[in-house]
A protein has these predicted regions:
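N-terminal basic, low-complexity leaders that serve as flexible interaction/assembly modules and, when applicable
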Residues: 1-78, 82-84, 291, 299, ...
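Glycine-rich, aromatic-flanked loop segments that form ligand/cofactor-binding clefts
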Residues: 4-20, 60-90, 110-154
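Short, basic, glycine/proline-bearing loop/turn elements
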Residues: 29-41, 97-108, 246
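Active-site gating loops and adjacent loop-to-helix segments of metal-dependent hydrolytic enzymes
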Residues: 34, 86-101, 155-156
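Generic detection of long, well-ordered alpha-helical segments
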Residues: 44-45, 109-112, 170
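Glycine-rich, proline-tolerant flexible connector loops at the mouths of alpha/beta enzymes
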Residues: 62-84, 94-95, 99-108, 192-210, ...
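Active-site loop segments of alpha/beta catalytic cores
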Residues: 113-334
Length: 334
């Protein structure tokens, strides 16, 4: 995994999956019957146990910490709640320029110490050959949650603040970028060997808006971590943004399934590694289809050093475990 991040030759393609510890696993569902999602995230020993059991069961080549994108917003003053069936809700959204002043600078990470403890506990339980991946939400995705008050289909509140109140927008993004930078570095200091920046909602933007309103802040968020370790930069929903994602930063660019991997790599540039990009829905089919489609993605990488196999998004909740195991065995050549 580490060699692939650096585009060095490898014996085989490394593989791990976003949401590899999730609701499709019976073991995970049993844990969730006893504790809520955020309670699990804030219990370092239990969060590490969930991921360690997943790595052991699946045989993946990396362990991303069990956490969420949004806890970073709580010490910054956001009233965050995870509700059953509705997902994350922010009860005090930032809708106007004046509201941005309510978002506190993240000067110390004491309230996020549980995340660093998850990193340490996960690292302690793994073989040295399996790297730990820390992660954070990208400034744009975090800003969208802050403004919308939760997830959205159109991101209208976000875009209106961005277009109408540009100075306030950049102030908000500056604050978030500095916070994310500190957060990623703290995870590296705690023992993560790789970090991933998730820009889950950036695909709602066109290239020029991304370049003007997002790119400089994503670059700030990744800059310090990039000096220390591989950074995976992942966005979803709009392949036309790929060259700009590479321009913003990241030694590895995550690719979703909306573009062929070979085309994506050419757009990103061969000076970067790439991660992806099987459609998660393929895992809902049958083992023969999973095997065939996995080989198709591997073929698109054309044997070039620097491909990390992953899905184009997270494992879906109703995915059969045997199909996940088939994918991993296929990548490994078993």
């Amino acid at each position: 995994m580490m060699r692939a991040c650096r585009r060095e030759p490898v014996e085989r393609t490394p593989v791990w999956l976003m949401r590899q510890a999730g609701r499709y696993l019976p073991e995970y569902r049993r844990v969730r019957e006893k504790v809520g999602f955020m309670e699990l995230c804030k219990n370092p020993s239990l969060a590490a146990e969930v991921m360690l059991a997943t790595v052991s069961r699946l045989g993946v080549d990396a362990a991303i910490i069990f956490s969420d994108l949004l806890p970073i917003l709580e010490p910054m003053g956001m009233d965050l709640e995870f509700t059953a069936g509705e997902g994350p809700v922010i009860h005090n959204p930032l809708r106007e320029a004046a509201d941005v002043e309510r978002l506190r600078e993240l000067h110390d990470l004491d309230q996020l110490s549980f995340v660093m403890d998850v990193v340490r506990a996960t690292r302690a339980g793994l073989d040295d050959s399996i790297p730990v991946i820390g992660f954070a939400g990208a400034p744009f995705t975090l800003a969208s949650y802050c403004i919308e008050g939760g997830s959205s289909r159109a991101w209208l509140h976000t875009k209106l603040l961005m277009y109408r109140q540009e100075s306030a927008w950049h102030d908000l993004m500056d604050r978030l970028a500095r916070a994310v930078s500190r957060y990623l570095v703290a995870q590296l200091d705690a023992g993560a060997q790789i970090v991933q920046l998730f820009d889950s909602w950036a695909g709602c933007l066109g290239p020029e808006d991304y370049r003007r309103y997002v790119l400089p802040h994503s670059r700030t968020a990744m800059a310090e971590a990039s000096r220390r370790a591989p950074v995976i930069h992942f966005a979803t929903g709009n392949p036309s943004l790929l060259p700009l994602l590479a321009l913003a930063g990241g030694s590895v660019i995550g690719i979703d399934w909306r573009i062929e991997l070979g085309q994506a790599w050419a757009a990103v540039g061969y000076d970067r590694a790439v991660q992806g990009n099987l459609d998660p829905a393929v895992l809902l089919t049958d083992r023969d289809t999973v095997r065939r489609r996995t080989h198709e993605v591997l073929a698109q990488a054309a044997g070039r050093p620097g491909h990390i196999f992953n899905l184009g998004h997270g494992v879906l909740p109703h995915t059969p475990v045997e199909n996940v195991l088939e994918l991993i065995a296929t990548v490994k050549g078993d």
